[in-house]
Amino acid sequence: MKSREHSCERTISMIGNKWILMIVNEFNTKKEPLRFNFLLEKLSPISSKTLSVKLKELVKYNILEKKISSMDPIIITYELTEKGKDLAGLFNSMTKWGKKWQKQ
């Protein structure tokens, strides 16, 4: 039982933030690499500083991968890792649950 509680607590500490959830959900919805400014616009009113911090956290947790192109100008994109895709699958369940119970 302790191991299960510890796993749940660790997961919540990683993703239990409004902006982390909103960012991962945006990747789950689009299913393609996304750029910083696109996320900043879609997640308004998030500040650029908050978005930057949360993206760094998601990269640190290996949920997102940051890719830097070798083109000029340099293009930076983020995309879900396998771990991130697995996490994004939870959003489908959360969406179904939300639709079912939103009227109560």
Residue ranges and their predicted role:
Residues 5, 89-104:
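Amphipathic alpha-helical dimerization/coiled-coil segments
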Residues 6-50:
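N-terminal helix-turn-helix DNA-binding core of bacterial DNA-binding proteins
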Residues 9-14, 65, 99-104:
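HhH-family (HhH-GPD) DNA N-glycosylase catalytic core used in base-excision repair
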Residues 51, 55-58:
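Basic amphipathic alpha-helical segments that dock to polyanions
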Residues 59-69:
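A short, conserved structural fragment
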Residues 70-91:
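Basic, amphipathic "hinge/linker" alpha-helix immediately C-terminal to the N-terminal HTH DNA-binding motif
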